[in-house]
From Swiss-Prot:
Pfam families recorded: Nse4-Nse3_bdg, Nse4_C
Subcellular location: Nucleus; Cytoplasm; Chromosome, Telomere
Chief site of localization: nucleus
Protein name: EP300-interacting inhibitor of differentiation 3
Encoding gene per record: EID3
GO BP annotations, alphabetical order: DNA recombination; DNA repair
Quaternary structure (record): Component of the SMC5-SMC6 complex which consists at least of SMC5, SMC6, NSMCE2, NSMCE1, NSMCE4A or EID3 and NSMCE3. NSMCE1, NSMCE4A or EID3 and NSMCE3 probably form a subcomplex that bridges the head domains of the SMC5:SMC6 heterodimer. Homodimer, and heterodimer with EID2. Interacts with the C-terminal region of CREBBP.
Taxonomic lineage: Eukaryota, Metazoa, Chordata, Craniata, Vertebrata
Native source species: Bos taurus
Protein family according to the UniProt entry: Belongs to the NSE4 family.
Length: 379
C-alpha cells in the first residue's frame, strides 16, 4: 500500500505519469480509487484558489488578472465532477423509486411526492443534456407510478346495494318481510299490498319534490265551440263534370283598337280647333311651338300634346318652321299660301316626333316662363 501511495504522489508531478499510475490500480481497490480522485479534485480546487489569491496580492490594481491566468482545463474538470455527481444522484433516485414501487402504489404514503421534490432540487443544477435525459427518465417512471396509484384508488361513490335499498324501502312503508322467514314475499304479495306500497311511496316522494305548475296553451280560437271544418274542394271532379257537359272556358276577345283610334282622332280634332281659334284671333302672329304644347303642370300631358300635334302637321293643317331666333313656331297653311299647289312642301310633308326629357321640360318651362297651358284638358 505504501508503494501505491508513493506512485500516486509521483503522478502529481506530470500528466502522463499520473495516468499510468491510475491504470496500475487493481479492480478490487475501486472504492479507494474513487476516494483518491475526490481528494485530487479538492487539491485542484485549493490550487486554483491559491493561484487566484497570489495573483490578487501581486497586482491589486488589475482585478481581472487572476481569472485570466486560471487554466480552463481545470475549470472543465471541476464542472465535469459536478455533473458526474448529479448523474449519480439521479441514478440513485431512480433505483430507489424502482425498488419501492409496490410500496408507492399500494400504500397511502407520500414517497412519490418526496421523490418528485428531490428531483426538482436536482434539476435546478442541470446544465447538460445527459443530466436532462436522466431527469426525463425519472419523470416517465413517476408518471407511470402515478397512473397505477390512481387506478388503485377505492371510490365508493358508484357503489349501490340494491338489496339493502329494497329492505330499507319495505321497512319505511311498513312492510317488513324479514320478520317471517317462511313467508315468500313474491307469492303472497297481492294487488292491495302493492297498491298500498306505491301510494305510500308516491305520497312521501311528492312531499320532498316541488311540483311544477301545469302549462296551458292559449293558441287557437277563444270561442267555446270548435271551428267548423271547411269542405275540401274536389277540383278533379269539377273538371270531369265540365268535360261531360261540354263547357269550355271563355276565350279572350280580340282587342278593340277602333275605339282607341276614334279617341285619338277626337283629341286631334279638339287640339286643331284650339289652334285654328288662335289663328283666327291673331291671324298675323304665329304661335310658339313650345308655348302651345307645353303643360307646365304635367310632363305626361306635354308628351301627349306633342304626339297629337304631330298628326296636325302630317295632315297639312299647320306647319313648323324656325323663326329669326331659331326657335320652332306653328303657322296655318291657309294664311300664307293660297292653295296646296303653291305649297312647295305639300308633296314632301313628313311626320316627326321630337324627344323630350323631364329635365328638358323643366328647362323650357323656366326659360319661356310658361305658367298656363294653351291646350286645356278635356277631362
Amino acid at each position: 500500500m505504501a508503494d501505491e501511495n508513493g506512485s500516486l504522489r509521483e503522478a502529481g508531478a506530470g500528466g502522463k505519469t499520473r495516468a499510468q499510475a491510475v491504470v496500475t490500480i487493481p479492480s478490487s481497490a475501486y472504492f479507494l480509487k474513487q476516494v483518491e480522485e475526490e481528494e485530487e479534485v479538492e487539491a485542484l480546487k485549493v490550487e486554483v484558489a491559491a493561484a487566484s489569491d497570489t495573483e490578487s496580492d501581486t497586482s491589486s490594481d488589475d482585478l481581472s488578472c487572476g481569472k485570466a491566468d486560471i487554466d480552463p482545463s481545470l475549470l472543465e474538470r471541476v464542472d465535469e465532477e459536478k455533473c458526474r455527481s448529479i448523474r449519480k444522484q439521479y441514478r440513485q433516485l431512480i433505483y430507489t423509486v424502482q425498488q419501492n414501487r409496490d410500496d408507492i402504489v399500494n400504500t397511502a404514503s407520500d414517497s412519490l411526492t418526496e421523490a418528485l421534490e428531490e428531483a426538482n432540487v436536482l434539476f435546478d443544477a442541470v446544465s447538460r443534456t445527459r443530466e436532462a435525459a436522466l431527469d426525463s427518465q425519472f419523470l416517465v417512471l413517476a408518471s407511470d407510478l402515478g397512473k397505477e396509484k390512481a387506478k388503485h384508488l377505492n371510490s365508493d361513490m358508484n357503489f349501490f346495494n340494491q338489496v339493502a335499498f329494497c329492505d330499507f324501502l319495505f321497512i319505511f312503508v311498513g312492510l317488513n318481510w324479514m320478520e317471517d322467514d317462511e313467508r315468500d314475499p313474491l307469492n303472497n304479495c297481492d294487488d292491495n299490498i302493492a297498491l298500498s306500497f306505491w301510494e305510500t311511496v308516491q305520497k312521501e316522494a311528492t312531499s320532498c319534490i316541488s311540483q311544477a305548475e301545469t302549462f296551458h296553451f292559449l293558441f287557437g280560437s277563444f270561442k267555446p265551440e270548435s271551428a267548423a271544418r271547411k269542405p275540401r274542394r274536389n277540383h278533379r271532379r269539377k273538371v270531369q263534370k265540365m268535360e261531360e257537359n261540354g263547357v269550355m272556358p271563355t276565350k279572350l276577345r280580340k282587342l278593340d283598337l277602333s275605339g282607341n283610334q276614334e279617341a285619338t282622332e277626337k283629341e286631334v280634332e279638339r287640339i286643331l280647333g284650339l289652334l285654328q281659334t288662335y289663328f283666327r284671333k291673331y291671324p298675323d302672329t304665329p304661335v310658339s311651338y313650345f308655348e302651345f304644347v307645353i303643360d307646365p303642370n304635367s310632363f305626361s300631358r306635354t308628351v301627349e300634346n306633342i304626339f297629337y300635334v304631330s298628326f296636325i302637321i302630317r295632315d297639312g293643317f299647320a306647319r313648323i318652321r324656325l323663326d329669326q331666333d331659331r326657335l320652332p313656331i306653328l303657322e296655318p297653311i291657309n294664311i300664307n299660301l293660297a292653295g296646296e299647289g303653291n305649297d312647295p312642301s305639300f308633296h314632301s310633308r313628313k311626320q316627326g316626333v321630337i324627344s323630350l326629357s323631364l329635365q328638358d321640360w323643366k328647362n323650357i318651362v323656366a326659360a319661356f316662363e310658361i305658367s298656363e297651358a294653351m291646350i286645356t284638358n278635356s277631362y
